[in-house]
Design a protein with these regions (language model features):
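Short glycine/proline-rich turn/loop motifs
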Residues: 10-13, 222-223
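Acidic/His- and Gly-rich active-site-bordering loop/insert found
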Residues: 1-9
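Short, glycine/serine-rich, charged loops/turns that create anion-binding
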Residues: 2, 57-59, 213
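Short, flexible helix-adjacent loops and helix caps
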Residues: 7, 39-42, 254
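Acidic/histidine-rich catalytic neighborhood of metal-dependent amide-processing enzymes
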Residues: 14-138
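Active-site-adjacent substrate-binding region
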Residues: 105-255
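Mixed-charge, polar/low-complexity N-terminal
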Residues: 10, 80-81, 86-87, 179-187
Length: 255
């Protein structure tokens, strides 16, 4: 991840930043999802394939390079995957039922707490994807009530930020969240500012998972994007909801 000059009078030099939230948080979610989905696939519990895709070049000047390349491959029927063993898998006949984009999911807004956005693109299929995310959020929130009654969590408080990744965080209560479904035409949706817009423009049903985004906060596109601004209880909750959403989408009948 990179941030630009640290003040408005700078020369615009690109400075290396840790990118703890943007976008290691979502990358961590993909890695957590992989063994769960692989096990379900081996057991024959998935009705459709799930691709875990790490998209490169979202920021300017690349301008969603990875998302554009993927969409081009899908539209032109040239989708092929190159394996580590040199084998090529032809996926040109695949039809994508939907895409979930995760971008910045681990910073709990200090002014509007415990909210994340479920931002669908255009079309009824995208709204169905958002409905699955809404149901997954309700399932998670119901689970937190039960999990927090256990002796190991009963007397604990909210999670607290840690200054860096070298510290083991304290165990905290599971955090219930409010997932706001924000249509692409609404002012609260930030789909337009992500890879999700590329998929929507190409006619692919898409939903963005993102924190309650604040463009003016410290730690966004600057060198302060470190563990010091990460809320692990919040990020873990959004990640769990996202994984549950994908599982639901891969197992429920399509509309």
């Amino acid at each position: 991840q990179y941030g630009y000059g640290t003040n408005k009078d700078g020369d615009g030099a690109r400075l290396a930043a840790a990118g703890a939230d943007d976008n290691h948080s979502a990358t961590s979610c993909l890695m957590l999802a992989a063994p769960i989905l692989m096990q379900m696939s081996r057991e024959g519990r998935l009705q459709r394939d799930v691709w875990l895709v790490h998209l490169t070049g979202e920021e300017f000047p690349a301008d969603c390079l990875g998302a554009r390349h993927l969409c081009q491959s899908l539209v032109e029927g040239g989708m092929r995957v190159h394996g580590e063993d040199g084998r090529i898998t032809d996926l040109s006949g695949a039809r994508v039922c939907g895409v979930y984009v995760l971008d910045m999911i681990a910073h709990n807004n200090d002014r509007s707490r415990d909210i994340f956005q479920i931002a669908p693109g255009s079309g009824p299929e995208a709204m169905w994807l958002a409905w699955q995310a809404h149901l997954a959020t309700a399932i998670w929130n119901a689970g937190t009530v039960l999990w927090n009654r256990r002796p190991s969590r009963r007397d604990l408080g909210r999670g607290r930020r840690i200054p860096h990744g070298g510290i083991v965080p304290e165990v905290a209560r599971h955090l219930a969240l409010h997932g706001e479904v924000r249509p692409h035409y609404g002012p609260g949706s930030t789909l337009f500012n992500t890879d999700g817009q590329i998929f929507s423009d190409a006619g692919v049903p898409v939903v963005l998972f993102m924190e309650n985004y604040d463009i003016n906060r410290k730690g966004y596109h600057d060198t302060h994007d470190t563990m010091a601004n990460i809320d692990l209880d919040y990020g873990a909750a959004v990640a769990a909801i996202a994984i549950e959403t994908v599982v639901r989408t891969a197992t429920e009948p399509l509309p």
